[in-house]
From Swiss-Prot:
InterPro entries: Pyrokinin_CS. Keywords: Amidation, Neuropeptide, Secreted. It comes from the Eukaryota. It comes from Panchlora sp. (strain SR-2005) (Cockroach). Its main location: secreted. This is Pyrokinin-5. GO terms for biological process: neuropeptide signaling pathway.
Length: 17
């Protein structure tokens, strides 16, 4: 998930990162 396509970061920082 997230704009970066990085689910590992999206789960912590949210879809904006």
């Amino acid at each position: 998930g997230g704009e970066t396509g990085n689910d590992a970061k999206a789960m912590w920082f949210g879809p904006r990162l």
